Amino acid sequence: MNKKSVCLVATSALLSISVGHADQQAGLRQQIVGVWSLVSQSVEKPDGSRVERFGADPKGIAFFDQSGRFAMILMRSDLPKITSNNAMTATDAENKAIMQGSTAFFGSWSADEATGTMLNRIDSATYPNWDGTDQKRTVSMSGDEMKVCVPSQIGGTSCAVWRRSH
């Protein structure tokens, strides 16, 4: 092979790698776009123990739209009913159980195929300390399931498994 041929082959290879990379990036984004139902959520702590903040049968929904907006709601399936039937007069114990057993947040999102991550820029959350923050999450896809992991506030890694809603 002469120099010109080697140059053409190398250039073609580099172009196909960068085109392939662009397709992969669009691929992860396209795979994430949609409506998702929560299957499980747990925190694996540094000592290996697991915590299921939202219980063994969590409820949740996540929306990721094409324009880069998202919303997520996660909760326990056994949240207590408010005895007074009035959210404004719930007891301290009821409020605590509801706050500790649920979370919701929304904002904008982007995906990075090269790192297998999603960046969530949180506009507002039921946990106000998240307002205006960025959270980088690892994402892995398997068929109609998406596993999303992020460092946990209690130490370790928090992972949620979502199933595409049809």
Give the ranges of each region predicted by the language model.
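Bacterial N-terminal signal peptides that target proteins for export
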Residues: M1-L8
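Bacterial N-terminal signal peptides
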Residues: L8-I17
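Lipid interaction determinants
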Residues: G20-H166
